[in-house]
Amino acid sequence: AYLEEWQAMAKAVLELFPPRDDLPAPDTLHTPKDWPDSDVLDDWSLLPTKPDWAPGFRKFWNVGEDAAHDRLDWWADEVGEYDEGRNLPSQDITSQMSPHLHWGEISPVTIWHRLKDKRSKGWKTYEKELIWRDYAQNVIMQFPDYGDEPYRNFDDSLWRNPNRGHLIQEELEAWQQGRTGYPIVDAGMRQLWQTGWMHNRVRMITASFLIKHLLIDWRHGERWFWDTLVDGDYASNGANW
C-alpha cells in the first residue's frame, strides 16, 4: 500500500508541478561589494588528511560540473536498461549521479530535461527516484530531526546499543570494516570505505544486515553512512534508513 501511495504521489507531482525550464549558465557574475566573513577550514573538524584516508576517492571519482555532464552523457545511453538492471550490483547500470547532485555540480532539472524524451521503463523508474530525492528534502523540512530520530513513536529497547557492551561494539566495527563473514555485506562495506559509494541494492542489504541480523540500533548505521558516503545527504540518508 505504501508503494502504491508513493507512486500515485510521484505521478501527481509531475502532472501538477512539472519541472521548470533548465536555465543556462550566466555569461557573467558580478562581484559583490561586501564579502561575508569566511570560516577557517580547520574549524570544520573534518577528517584528518594525514595519513591520507581517501586515496580511493580520487581514483574512482571525477569531480566538477564537466565531470557531472560527462557522466550524464554516458547515462543518457544507459538509462533504458535501468529498470531491469538496477538491482544487479555486478553490473554498471546505475547513474552514479548522486554525488554530483549532492554537491551541486548538476541540477536534477538539468537531468530531467536531458532524459525526458527517453521513452523507456528505465527512464520512468529513474524519474521517480529523482522525485524521491526531492521528497526526502521535503520530509526533512517538516521533521528536522528525521536524520537522527524517527518521526513515529519508537522503543529504544528493540535495539542492541554498542555503547552497552564490548561484544556489540566489536560486531558494529566488523560491519563497518567489512569483516562480518557474509561476502555481499563485506564487499559492500569495503567498497564504501575505498570509494565512498555503494550500489543502492547493496546499501539495502548491508543496512538490513545491521538492523535485522545484528539487531544494532539503526542510527549507528546511519551515522556511518553519513561519515563515509561521498553522496551523504542528510535528508536522503535519514529517509532511507
Locations of regions flagged by a protein language model:
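Active-site-proximal binding-pocket segments
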Residues: 92-241
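Glycine/tryptophan-enriched, flexible segments
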Residues: 2-159
